[in-house]
Amino acid sequence: MATVPEPTSEMMSYYYSDNENDLFFEADGPRKMKCCFQDLNNSSLEDEGIQLHISHQLHNKSLKHFVSVVVALEKLKKVSLPCSQPLQDDDLKNIFCCIFEEEPIVCEVYDDDAFVCDAPLQSLDCKFRDISQKSLVLYNSCELRALHLNGSSVNQQAVFRMSFVQGDENSNKIPVALCIKEKNLYLSCVMKDGKPTLQLEMLDPRVYPKKKMEKRFVFNKTEIKETLEFESSQFPNWYISTSKAEAMPVFLGNTKGGQDITDFTMELSS
């Protein structure tokens, strides 16, 4: 163990000063003095001019600080430094490695579900029609159908709340959740009889919608000119679709440009 040299009387009176507003180390500070220990016998340190500078301006001074500096200097005595050139930054880095002990950094991984975002969820109230002008209507409180409406029957058109949720990052697609407003019925995609199927699920309004929805409720919205497509996040390449026939259920289809209609127009609802 390295022997700590006895501090001079000048240094001890300095360390036990009553001025608590002094700074401990200040490289270019005023009224600084040098303290050179007589037993630093390493010629490389002396030749390169490594010295301890102590300022009269201290903060949080203690004997522990003094001892730490002396121990560091004792360690420096054991460091072999080349004397052929002035001290470089890399040499100082190696000196630090000898003085200080490296400790591992422990990174803690947190579950995103454990955190709740305080920011309100962005949403829009809207109505949809397919490109053949069929409106989406709630039928028997459990099924969504597409049919042409006119006159007073226009009021039957379902009003959706489209919430912008978390999903796969894609610059061309926006993840959303679709809920029939006032009914808390969410469009979801599940596997039934070996085929992706669109259904309505009633959810607790105190919990839903939320930023991180279950994947079956998420649709990737794509805007093409003035029309929209809604692709299932759970089943890629499957889209919310309507039939060309009248009053048929809205379904999940994987055919674009054929008998299935996958393009919709949106109208904001007040």
UniProtKB/Swiss-Prot annotation:
SMART domains registered for this protein in UniProt: IL1 (SM00125)
PROSITE patterns listed in its UniProt record: INTERLEUKIN_1 (PS00253)
Keywords carried by this UniProt record: Cytokine, Cytoplasm, Inflammatory response, Lysosome, Mitogen, Pyrogen, Secreted
Maturation propeptide residues: 1-118
Database matches in InterPro entries: IL-1_CS (IPR020877), IL-1_fam (IPR000975), IL-1_propep (IPR003502), IL1/FGF (IPR008996)
Further details from the record: IL1B production occurs in 2 steps, each being controlled by different stimuli. First, inflammatory signals, such as LPS, stimulate the synthesis and promote the accumulation of cytosolic stores of pro-IL1B (priming). Then additional signals are required for inflammasome assembly, leading to CASP1 activation, pro-IL1B processing and eventually secretion of the active cytokine. IL1B processing and secretion are temporarily associated.
Protein name from the UniProt record: Interleukin-1 beta
Organism: Eumetopias jubatus (Steller sea lion)
Organism lineage: Eukaryota, Metazoa, Chordata, Craniata, Vertebrata
